[in-house]
Amino acid sequence: MESIPVLGTAIVNTPHWVWRLFYSIDYPVDNFVVFNNNGRGQIDYELDLLKVAPHRYIKNVHVCHLPANLGCSGAWNLIIKSFMKAPYWVISNHDVMYEPGFLREMAREAAKPEIGVVHGKNGGWDIFALKDWMVQRYGLFDENLYPGYCEDMDYGMRFIHDDVPRTLSLETGYYH
């Protein structure tokens, strides 16, 4: 099975949760990216340490400090746009922790060509994989929904009547 091309998250505060997320990764990831939406320099140092922290499953760590909070959808779009050639993007809340095997299962589901979105649990958007063809067909997340909330439901409304195949829940769990 191939590695996850991109696993990204956005954060405004509480960087200790990102570290928990980081060390719960137990499956190969090519690019782990963090968009720091804090904009005040309060958590820059703690996040920069991720770039030098050893991790056997992560090939590249990218931390980008934004000058202001661009919002949830803005950060999600940056994850996608920063790795435009990826076949899919795993986007996760920063305070999620994966159980062993969760990312392997997500990668297996995302490898199915017909699947458009893989949700972690019950169709939720706290951790999901979005395929490249979904972005080509339905666009990016609406940044007018600022700073957060409803960007996920707005995106889902775009394809709900097209009967896009989705994986709504994985067998393996995660904590959030």
Language model segments and positions:
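Short alpha-helix within the catalytic core of nucleotide-sugar-dependent glycosyltransferases
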Residues: 22, 77, 86, 100-111, ...
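Short beta-strand-to-loop acidic/aromatic patch adjacent to the donor-nucleotide binding site
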Residues: 86-97
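Glycine-rich, basic loop-to-helix element that forms the pyrophosphate-binding segment
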Residues: 66-83
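Acidic donor-binding segment of Leloir-type glycosyltransferases
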Residues: 26-64
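Conserved nucleotide-sugar donor-binding
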Residues: 125-139
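Conserved donor NDP-sugar-binding/catalytic core segment of glycosyltransferases
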Residues: 96-127
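Donor nucleotide-sugar recognition loop
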Residues: 139-161, 165-175
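Short, well-formed alpha-helical segments that are part of the catalytic scaffolds
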Residues: 13-27
